[in-house]
């Protein structure tokens, strides 16, 4: 199932939220009706919060069913809210505050529950990232861009990436994430940073409200969401 929506008129949903197979985080600005619809489409418990006193949740955090990485500028109150949410939903998730010069972990890491791709900008933290997310990783860029997280969206079934990703890079991504499908595409009528526009897991996807019909078809194919 795929749902189209905006967050207060904004279509870059992946910048402002995070979705995994088992949980989701959304900005405080999202109304309750939209929250319930997204929770239903993705079939996950979710909560609303800030990270580092910011709504840029998807840019700053990265997570999967095993772990969650947040920047060390995340406040104690925010960390406690996350811990409380995880406990209330009986989720055994490793939560790590990582100190790094570049705090945009969501932009620089692409992960599912089988593997992760780490931007060269975070290569020195590879072991920590692997341990927290409990997956093996590959370090590198694709489409000549270091922002591997914001230029891709991955689930345990498939992956959609920047349209300039070449064939060798597609094969590399597929091998690391261990998915059946890796496709190139766009969202929000031509935006190439698909990770900034889409929230997805193996059960559904939420896409920016500007996303066209042909783009939705490609997203469904790449993420294996066609019924």
Swiss-Prot record:
GO terms for molecular function: ribosome binding; translation initiation factor activity. The keyword Protein biosynthesis applies. GO terms for biological process: cytosolic ribosome assembly. The keyword Protein biosynthesis applies. Transmembrane segments: none annotated. It comes from the Archaea. InterPro entries: eIF6. It holds the Pfam family eIF-6. Keywords: Initiation factor, Protein biosynthesis. Belongs to the eIF-6 family. Binds to the 50S ribosomal subunit and prevents its association with the 30S ribosomal subunit to form the 70S initiation complex. This is Translation initiation factor 6. It comes from Methanococcus maripaludis (strain C7 / ATCC BAA-1331).
